[in-house]
């Protein structure tokens, strides 16, 4: 794990509970103690302006909100991964999270694809949450619901 060549997150006091959770293979979110809304890394609730947020374990499930396939390495650590993807995941709890889709050919990634979190221990200190297609995902022949048709 010591030869990881890609950029690593900056872990500070505000984000430490998130990264400690990832190390335990748990996806952590903040939740408003007043209204229950979930957030990724915020300082107060967007809905009720409550500043009392608590860290809670998330379900780890979500859907692909949007994604991009990179055919050029913008950092030398990614050159052997070309083409690689990045995705914005809409978590079941509501927040959006930028990550990667693993265990799925890039050609099969679609907006609305159900996903679940997996963890990659990249160094002795850092574990990255990534996502893979959920076990209950539709087959490639099953069209995904159109926008506005519900979940």
What is the predicted function of each stretch?
Residues 1-27, 133-134:
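A broadly conserved sequence feature marking short terminus-proximal activation segments
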Residues 23-61:
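Cys/His-rich short segments
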Residues 31, 61-63, 88, 100, ...:
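Residues located in well-ordered beta-strands
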Residues 67-73, 120-124:
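Short, conserved beta-turn/loop elements at beta-strand boundaries and strand-helix junctions
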Residues 81-97:
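Short, basic/aromatic beta-hairpin or loop at an interaction surface
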Residues 94, 99-136:
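Well-ordered alpha/beta subsegment
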